[in-house]
Amino acid sequence: MSVSTKRLEMDEEAEEAFDLFDVTHKGYIDFEDLRRSCAQLGENLTKEQLQLMLDLAGTNGKVSREEFAELWIHIS
């Protein structure tokens, strides 16, 4: 598999994952999106833990599609 093919597959996976969080299709993931998604996955995180996740993403409380894709690449 070529590097560009692998990158394309990662981009598609990131897009699908982003859409699971951004259920209202705002174009970004905010605190409420993160809270709801984690709860649906059975992860009952505190407000502080959720906020820390957003802070670690280096955002202003909103994770854009592009920022999410960059994070996805680093954790994949």
UniProtKB/Swiss-Prot annotation:
Subcellular compartments: Cytoplasm; Nucleus
GO cellular component, one term: centriole
Keywords: Calcium, Cytoplasm, Nucleus, Repeat
GO annotation (BP), single: microtubule cytoskeleton organization
All copies of domain EF-hand, residue ranges: 9-44, 43-76
One Pfam match: EF-hand_7
Keyword Cell division belongs to the record: no
Protein's UniProt name: Uncharacterized calcium-binding protein C1687.14c
Organism: Schizosaccharomyces pombe (strain 972 / ATCC 24843) (Fission yeast)
